[in-house]
Amino acid sequence: MESQLQSIFEEMVKTEIIEEAFAGMFMDTPEDERTKLISCLGAFRQYWSVLPQESHEQCVQWIVKFIHGQHSPKRISFLYDCLAMAVETGLLPPRMVCEALINSDSLEWERTQLWILTFKLIRKIIGGVDYKGVRDLLKVILEKIQTVPDTVSSAVVQQLLAAREVVAYILERNACLLPAYLAVTEVLKLYPEGKLPHWLLGDLVSDFVDSFRPTARIGSICGRCSLLPVVNNSGAICNSWKLDPLTLRFPLKGLLPYDKDLFEPQTALLRYVLEQPYSRDMVCNMLGLNKQHKQRCPVLEDQLVDLVVYAMERSETEEKYDDGGTSQLLWQHLSSQLIFFVLFQFASFPHMVLSLHQKLAGRGLIKGRDHLMWVLLQFISGSIQKNALADFLPVMKLFDLLYPEKECIPVPDITKPQSTHSFAMTCIWIHLNRKAQNDNSKLQIPIPHSLKLHHEFLQQSLRNKSLQMTDYKIALLCNAYSTNSECFTLPMGVLVETIYGNGNVNIPLPGSNCMASGSITPLPMNLLDSLTVHAKMSLIHSIATRVIKMAQAKSTFALAPALVETYSRLLVYMEIESLGIKGFISQLLPTVFKSHAWGILHTLLEMFSYRMHHIQPHYRVQLLSHLHSLAGVPQTNQNQLHLCVESTALRLITALGSSEVQPQFTRFLSDPKTVLSAESEELNRALILTIARATHVTDFFTGSESIQGTWCKDILQTIISFTPHNWALHTLSCFPAPLQAFFKQNNVPQESRFNLKKNVEEEYRKWKSMTNENDIITHFSLQGSPPLFLCLLWKMLLETDQINQIGYRVLERIGARALVAHVRTFADFLVYEFSTSAGGQQLNKCIEMLNDMVWKYNIVTLDRLILCLAMRSHEGNEAQVCYFIIQLLLLKPNDFRNRVSDFVKENSPEHWLQNDWHTKHMNYHKKYPEKLYFEGLAEQVNPPVQIQPQYLPIYFGNVCLRFLPVFDIVIHRFLELIPVSKSLETLLDHLGGLYKFHDRPVTYLYNTLHYYEMQLRDRTNLKRKLVHAIIGSLKDNRPQGWCLSDTYLKFGMNPRDDNPWIPDDTYYCKLIGRLVDTMAGKSPGPFPNCDWRFNEFPNPAAHALHVTCVELMALAVPGKDVGNALLNVVLKSQPLVPRENITAWMNAIGLIITALPEPYWIVLHDRIVNILNSPSLTSETEWVGYPFQLFDFTACHKAYSEMSCSYTLALAHAVWHHSSIGQLSLIPKFLPEVLIPIVKTEYQLLYVYHLIGPFLQRFQQERTRCMIEIGVAFYEMLLNVDQCSTHLSFMDPVCDFLYHMKYMFTGDSIKDQVEKIICNLRPALKLRLRHITHISTESAAPPPPPMNSGSPAPQPNQVPVSVPLTVTQ
């Protein structure tokens, strides 16, 4: 090939001798030149036509090499003309020629003539190259330009500019050689933000990059760096808060010149989240940290160190380290965070200690030194045995810095808990020394002189064999010697013996035949807080081992109350999770179950029901799954255990947080049976109500009509197959629409009341006619026989006032599990009986008999009967009768009211502060004994049956506490039926005090007001009553100002039907300000300090958000007005809102308004419509300017030139940033129905793009269907504007954004829809957008995966979408 080409091209450049002799004087005419070119190309054309396809590229490269080997500029010029003609006549492909030219090794800037001629040729033919080829050429050209040095002779600058002209042509917007979006990607790869472009390109490149700043802003959330989340315990995290784990930057889509602050590390965001108690799961989610992969995260390490330094600064200003003070809470939290992140190796202990030393050096911060050493001791004592001594030695460097004393530090008062912190450094030294001895290390660390007195005191205490619990000496010894088993056994032995009891004294527990070991006083929280994590782990391990041993030994004695209470308290420490709650759920429970130790199982379930706080949702759902499998085991078919299992399951189901339901149940989609009850209709109904509430509060179903394709479809279908049932219309009407549709489709035929009555009469006739006792017992207790026996007992009592002994025997034989079905039927039968009752005397008799069945004969417990009644699906009048029965059962006799009032009066919900719970518990049970084995009936039958049932130990529970989750359900049922409102008020008046013991009273109130917003809109008195009853029940146990604002308590709590209180702007500003101050960590904060470990909410911000929402929903003001008032806090000029902090206020409004029902936040859509219709966006003559300045909130705000459109834009972004995907999914509906018809101008179009552009990423990740609808709507809107405008000034930013959308989000998924729209646009737009659809027709090859993280698994309501095209294509 080479020889043929050689001869062809040498022939081309052959000249006569005379021409060479007079080279500068001979000149061809243009005609001669052309003739020569054509004749020369003829020979080549012939050769090219027979050349195989695969040799084309090699051939072109040889030609270029041949040309570049020439030395005569004239010859090169002639050959380049030949190449140009070959391209123009279609002989050679332009892309191949350009690539060969630019990639030639001979093309160097020093050969200026060749450089000029080459780039002129490229400029001439590049127009024929496809856009992908142009992109590749741009990349190589930019790299080639990089080879030009920073300093060159001015003589050659002109020649070098030929390359610049080619770049200018490629970047020329009107030429449209390639999407400008792809060009800027290449430019920014070579010259990222902050790096200057090559001097040859200078302003050309920087101006081009600047032209993309509007596109970058369209894709950015206003004030994003100031937006902060509220940390919840659920671990659920929205993609909005993800950060790069190496740089802490936001993961921005596409290479665009985003605002500088978006490229900065978001240390403030991570620091804020780290400061929040119970935030570790969110931190892991934000940074993508996985516990299974031990990966050090230096940025996290730095923030932890900074947080410790901040705590040291705080300690310097605080007068004293008081119990429950801000400083104590901060150090407590820091200790927990440090252990977690260092334990899972996300942070390195020695690195952190050295970094701390560096940051504290020369600062003189020593007031907090003991607390710092206490935090370090936590980790050292627990891990020094498994790690090298060298890892811990940097602590001694820190000691030298923080303990400069020359004299001995005196021994502190050891009756105070903080004395354990004062001893922390001495304890560290003892552990280090012990490690050095064990490792036979030559390195001996002498005791520092300043710690001598402390050390001597510990040595002396160790010699004292009779340690008392009156001071903190035991804790000190445990902390100092936890790695020295000889010394540790004594103090730990004292602690253990204190709570186990010595075995000589036994005490009775409630019920008959139940005795426990005699220790009743638990270890106080102050003492447990004073133990290191290592000591706590030893203690909890010892307790768990003891429990397992007792379970396996089938011990006749129950666990000591002190042990059970202490174990509960230890489970609150997140630092010991592996031995704590994880061991409890995955090791202890299964072992106890396997050993058939039903007493201990009952104890563990009681602990979980009444003593556990902030348990992660996956543990709770795991326990629920255990309970459902337990329910089917024959041994659990025992009255007390069955009641406990069902009661615990009910609590677990109803207590699930709205944001927890979907993530947790999605884990069981492959086998939903494990989290559902195979036989309990009530538990399955409770789960459906929880799903309805969760999907309503999170707006999961917003915009959906069906549950098809969603996570709850299989769950609902399995429930219907397990326990077929219907819902009353008044309950169903509150469900989200897709759930309503499901239950209407899956309607279950119900037995008529008439049939029920007939069957009961028939069975009763059988009862009266049968004479053989065994036959009667067999017939009525037979599995599969109609569950009507309680109806028969009722009839017996009505007719004869007594039940005979056979009745008792049948009940005993039926068994606890089967009896539930009888209670269900009995509930329906009662409604029938009361509905047909003549009233008066007969009604009183019915009520009396019903109460006797509960309190006198102990046939069914009150909580079980009320739950069954509340869960039936009666309609209309029958529903009212059902609720009437519930009210009578709860209030008519004094039995339950007395129990409630005495329990509320005598007890406190703050169990962690009590040491006499057991005494009060026993006193209550002596006064109101629980009878769970039909004892009353056994005594009353003739002849009486002597029974002494074996009770399982009861440590915490009673009928009042068991009734609380049932009461939650009862209130909801009463709210659904308007005619029974007054009855509900009466119930709240008499029993509302029970909410003092509710573990989540504010959450319950929040969920209730949110879910029933529509039902409560016009029932302001009932709303007020509900809030008053629940919040008022806690007044004696909460400090002033813990929940509702003073203004609301003063004006909102007073019923004024004629003239309801309408709050003013000041009220809303103060309410928002309270959340702003809380999130800013203001000290003292708006809310009183508390121990968050035992609080309903995990941290101050979560508490502030929920109480604020409760108060706003409780106002006697329509949701729409409240929503507008909240928006006005920043959209109107408010003297109480500081300008410099405006984004923090917008953040707070976003958090609050998105946590409220739809009527509150939907008003934002009206504000957007008002802005779009405002003169500044509809009339181009209204003002002369650049719309991107108008929409730049930050710049406008700083320049005091803000306009309502930029404020509304920033506020909308804050609201939508905090919105759930359900709330955001109204946008695709809002666009075509409301916005498209009104968008007529470019400014309006750009405003809508600015509004919605930043959220395309959320839609892509969480609901692709919505992203596709929005993508199409953007083009339809552009068509509208195009047809309504004579001139378009901002075509380039609009098109750049549409390309950004294509390459980063939609890919080819909307190609077909938008192709038709693009065809109808004006030529200039059509030219710019031609690559949007042209790209896929030109290349049939499938696109590679996106360069950013891929889209997650398809979510509900998603449709298949082609993978977004990457800008690397």
From Swiss-Prot:
<dbReference type="GO" id="GO:0006357">
    <property type="term" value="P:regulation of transcription by RNA polymerase II"/>
</dbReference>
<dbReference type="GO" id="GO:0016592">
    <property type="term" value="C:mediator complex"/>
</dbReference>
<feature type="compositionally biased region" description="Pro residues">
    <location>
        <begin position="1341"/>
        <end position="1357"/>
    </location>
</feature>
<keyword id="KW-0010">Activator</keyword>
<comment type="function">
    <text>Component of the Mediator complex, a coactivator involved in the regulated transcription of nearly all RNA polymerase II-dependent genes. Mediator functions as a bridge to convey information from gene-specific regulatory proteins to the basal RNA polymerase II transcription machinery. Mediator is recruited to promoters by direct interactions with regulatory proteins and serves as a scaffold for the assembly of a functional preinitiation complex with RNA polymerase II and the general transcription factors.</text>
</comment>
<feature type="region of interest" description="Disordered">
    <location>
        <begin position="1337"/>
        <end position="1369"/>
    </location>
</feature>
<dbReference type="GO" id="GO:0010628">
    <property type="term" value="P:positive regulation of gene expression"/>
</dbReference>
<dbReference type="InterPro" id="IPR021629">
    <property type="entry name" value="Mediator_Med23"/>
</dbReference>
<keyword id="KW-0805">Transcription regulation</keyword>
<protein>
    <recommendedName>
        <fullName>Mediator of RNA polymerase II transcription subunit 23</fullName>
    </recommendedName>
</protein>
<keyword id="KW-0539">Nucleus</keyword>
<dbReference type="Pfam" id="PF11573">
    <property type="entry name" value="Med23"/>
</dbReference>
<dbReference type="GO" id="GO:0005667">
    <property type="term" value="C:transcription regulator complex"/>
</dbReference>
<keyword id="KW-0804">Transcription</keyword>
<comment type="similarity">
    <text>Belongs to the Mediator complex subunit 23 family.</text>
</comment>
<comment type="subunit">
    <text>Component of the Mediator complex.</text>
</comment>
